[in-house]
Each structure stands twice: as structure tokens, then as C-alpha cells.
A protein has these predicted regions:
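Nucleotide/phosphate-binding catalytic cleft detector across ATP-hydrolyzing
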Residues: 1-154, 173-188, 200, 207-302
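A contiguous pocket-lining binding segment that forms or flanks enzyme active sites
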Residues: 196
């Protein structure tokens, strides 16, 4: 079984499932076993809020444990056998791909095989046979080659939880020299917006409320708080567009593909005066994970 996983700072995504990348350890059984991973005698509640930012994802076991939870969730969704062999298809930003590739592969492909654990009180026995790594963002375009057709140059803007990753593709090939990673992800926007709402209204709105308003979804909230969130959403998009320009890219001259969790926010808050050349939005947060799987399937088919 091929399982594609996008290890985001904000959320863990597979082809079919997404949950927050938070994790809390318990020495004793929690009050509910929902989303609970039991591994080596400890209990881990997966998907609870957001964990402390760790730029090196291999510095602790959190992302490994979240990987096991993601495998279990994907098996559950596919109604597959819980004793199975898995090939993991994962990604890294192209800007750090060469530097981090080997370490991240070894982090996920451990000597302890098969990996045995309980998830939501059900037993899993997983043989991780291999870990394939691909550039994130670019891999999602494996699902949408039409966005590159007849375009000599395209700018890919992946707005993630902590970073905005930029990459220009020339004749559908990534130009490694153009890769940039800006620390302007959605987490920054949400944190700064929450603080601005507190200052202006005295209200302490939640991350989930802010997200819903930024995406234009319904949410019961004081109108003055809603206005602050919407205004901050526009300011956030202006910061991203300005930072992209300062990084040497002309959004008015080159077609752009926006993806990641923040692409939906950008689509809602971008205006005609921004003059973006042929913007395309991949709003599916599962696109990277699905793209990783597609590439491995294509490799097998050859």
C-alpha cells in the first residue's frame, strides 16, 4: 500500500484525511480513545491543537508518531487490512530537499519493523518497506499537468502553516536557483489576527473562529471582531504579495499557481488591483499527499 503524507507544521494530510499536527502524551489511558495512539506503553492524543514549532521535524518523535496515526487513519478510510506493508511517499521543500532528505528518510524508516501499535483501541502491524521523498508543491502538479501546458514559466506559491515556499518552473522543470522559503505561513496570520482582535475589541476569539471568517464561512461572532479579522486577512495577503515581489518574482508577468492551506484565504482576499497574471488556485489541502502517491504509482508503472 502506498500512503502519501504531507507533514505540515499546521496539519498532517494524507490523500483522504487531515488533522492538526498537535500531539499530547499521557502516561495513563485518557478518558476517550478517539484519535489515541498507543505506542511503547504510552498514550498519545493526536490532532489536538498545534504543537510548539520545531523547524527540524526529526528533533523529536512527534512527527513519527503522527505518521503512525496518519497511516492508521488512511487504512481506516480505505477499509484496508491493519496488518500490511506500506511505502511512505512524503515531501520536503525544494529549498531544503537535498540537505534534509536523507535524515528525514532515516527518521521515518526505522530498524524496528514491523511497527506495532494500537490506534483507537485497534491493533496495527505495519511493515514500512520504503520511504520515497519528493519536492512538495511541485509534486501536487503531478495531478494538474494542465496548469503547466503551453506556459514557458510558472511560479508556484505554496502557502503552508509556517512557511510560504516559492519556486519557478521553466518549461515544467523546477528551477532550483529560484527556490525561496518565507516565514509568512497561515499560523503567523492567525496569531497576529487574534492579538489584533484582543487589542481592538477585548475579545479572545479562537484559531478555529479566525480560520472560518478568513475563509468566508459562517461563524457566530461580534461584527467588530469579524471586521478586524477580514481586514487583517487582506493585510496578510498584501504582505505575502509584497514578499514574493521582494524575492525577485514578478506576479504581474508570470502565471502563478497558489496552493496550500493559505491559498483559499488568498483567493478570497486578492483584488483586481493586485494585477496577478493568470492566478490558479489549488485549494485541495490533500494535493501534496495525493501527488506523492501519484508519482510513486507512475514509478511502479514503468
Amino acid at each position: 500500500m502506498i500512503v502519501g503524507i504531507d507533514h505540515g507544521y499546521y496539519a498532517i494530510k494524507t490523500k483522504h484525511v487531515s488533522f492538526p499536527s498537535g500531539i499530547i502524551k499521557y502516561d495513563y489511558e485518557p478518558y476517550t480513545m478517539q484519535n489515541v495512539l498507543q505506542y511503547r506503553g504510552k498514550y498519545y492524543v493526536c490532532g489536538t491543537g498545534r504543537q510548539t514549532l520545531v523547524k527540524n521535524k526529526t528533533s523529536n518523535d512527534n512527527y513519527y508518531l503522527l505518521t503512525l496515526a496518519a497511516i492508521a487513519e488512511e487504512i481506516k478510510h480505505r477499509k484496508a487490512e491493519r496488518k500490511t506493508e506500506v511505502i511512505l511517499a512524503v515531501g520536503l521543500p525544494l529549498s531544503s530537499f537535498g540537505r534534509e532528505k536523507q535524515g528525514f528518510r532515516e527518521y521515518l524508516l526505522r530498524k524496528e519493523q514491523p511497527v506495532c501499535f494500537l490506534y483507537e483501541s485497534e491493533w496495527y502491524e505495519i511493515q514500512i518497506k520504503d520511504v520515497k521523498l519528493f519536492p512538495q508543491g511541485y509534486s501536487a502538479l503531478a495531478l494538474h499537468p494542465e496548469y503547466l501546458k503551453n506556459e514557458p514559466s510558472v511560479l508556484l506559491v505554496d502557502i503552508g502553516g509556517w512557511t510560504v515556499d516559492l519556486m519557478r518552473l521553466d518549461n515544467a522543470v523546477p528551477n532550483a536557483a529560484t527556490c525561496r522559503s518565507l516565514e509568512l505561513g497561515v499560523i503567523r496570520c492567525i496569531d497576529e489576527t487574534a492579538e489584533q482582535v484582543r487589542r481592538n475589541t477585548g475579545l479572545s476569539v479562537t484559531e478555529t473562529q479566525i480560520e472560518r471568517v478568513l475563509r468566508g464561512e459562517t461563524c457566530s461572532m461580534a461584527e467588530d471582531a469579524r471586521v478586524v479579522i477580514q481586514e487583517n486577512g487582506r493585510k496578510y495577503i498584501e504582505r505575502i504579495l509584497s514578499a514574493v515581489t521582494e524575492s525577485g518574482f514578478d506576479l504581474r508577468a508570470v502565471p502563478s499557481v497558489f496552493m496550500g492551506g493559505g491559498s483559499e484565504i488568498l483567493k478570497r482576499h486578492v483584488i483586481a488591483q493586485d494585477a496577478i497574471c493568470r492566478p490558479v488556485f489549488i485549494e485541495d489541502v490533500h494535493a501534496n499527499a495525493a501527488g506523492y502517491e501519484r508519482i510513486v504509482e507512475q514509478m511502479w508503472a514503468k
